[in-house]
Amino acid sequence: MKARVEYIKLPRCYTKTYRKIEAKKNNDGTIELTLEETMQVISFKLPPALNAKLEQIAIKEKKSKSEIIRIALARYVENV
C-alpha cells in the first residue's frame, strides 16, 4: 500500500492560541487534515461568591462556565 504524503508549512503562532486538528477520511481513501484555530486562553480571578453563582448558572443552563462568561462579555461589549 502506498501513501501519498503532502507536507505543509504551518504558520507560527505568537499568541497562546491553541489549535485543533480534525481528520476526515475521503471516499478515495485519503485522509484530509484540517487545522483550526481555537480560542485564546485568558485567566482571571473571581471572588468565591461570584464563582459560586457562575457555577449555579452553568449547571442550570447546562453550559460551561467559559461559555456563560463569553456570552455575558459579548453582551457587555456590544453595549459599551
UniProtKB/Swiss-Prot annotation:
Source species, domain of life: Viruses
- List all membrane-crossing ranges: none
Pfam families per the record?
RHH_1 (PF01402)
InterPro entries attached here?
Arc_rbn_hlx_hlx, CopG, Ribbon_hlx_hlx
Cross-referenced SUPFAM superfamilies:
Ribbon-helix-helix
Any single biological process term in GO: regulation of DNA-templated transcription
Role? Essential for virus function.
Tell me the protein's name. Uncharacterized protein C-80
